[in-house]
Amino acid sequence: MATLDAIREALPEPARDIKLNLQAVLQPGTLTPAQRWGVAVATAAAARNERLLAAVLADARAEVEPAVVEDALAAAAVMAMNNVYYRFRHMVGKASYAEKPARLRMNRLVKPAASKVDFELFALAVSAVNGCETCVRSHEQVVVAGGLSEDQVHEAVRIAAVLHAAAVSLELAGYAAVPSAAAAAG
């Protein structure tokens, strides 16, 4: 994980916990390499930090097939749309909106390049990052029905949380070095 090692080293001191967690969550566990790296790619894309995404993509491409990376990126793209749409319907809470057809194309959900269950796991992780309760519940039901355990779901969401925190922490790097007003006046 040479590229993510550089990301970890770039994290400022206030993000020390994130630095340690970033190393830990991508170690082998209950997820397959395709699941682990797919979740990492999808959630790094959802976090919208180019530097983090480039690092995760470089490491993922060394570990998994191109179809996994394509599916992870597709999950991030489709969920960027779906999470907004379904979160709106959920938040408004009106039956009239729930009855309206979405009329949004989401063919990749039905026919991913690699594993259907893995794609759903990537979508679940992105939905957790994006805060769409409806999508989280839906994708969690699909992956559990597809044979994944709650431990695997939990591991995926841990990866999502840490990747999101890493993206935020990279943004902090410039601010951590700026002296406070009190120190500057000192």
From Swiss-Prot:
Its EC number is 1.11.1.28. Disulfide bonds join C132-C135. It comes from the Bacteria. GO terms for molecular function: alkyl hydroperoxide reductase activity; disulfide oxidoreductase activity; hydroperoxide reductase activity; peroxiredoxin activity. The keyword Disulfide bond applies. InterPro entries: AhpD, AhpD-like, AhpD_core, CMD-like. It catalyses: N(6)-[(R)-dihydrolipoyl]-L-lysyl-[lipoyl-carrier protein] + a hydroperoxide = N(6)-[(R)-lipoyl]-L-lysyl-[lipoyl-carrier protein] + an alcohol + H2O. Keywords: Antioxidant, Disulfide bond, Oxidoreductase, Peroxidase, Redox-active center. One of its GO terms (biological process) is cell redox homeostasis. The active site is at C132, C135. The keyword Lipid biosynthesis does not apply. Gene3D superfamilies: AhpD-like. SUPFAM superfamilies: AhpD-like. Antioxidant protein with alkyl hydroperoxidase activity. Required for the reduction of the AhpC active site cysteine residues and for the regeneration of the AhpC enzyme activity. Belongs to the AhpD family. This is Alkyl hydroperoxide reductase AhpD. It comes from Anaeromyxobacter sp. (strain K).
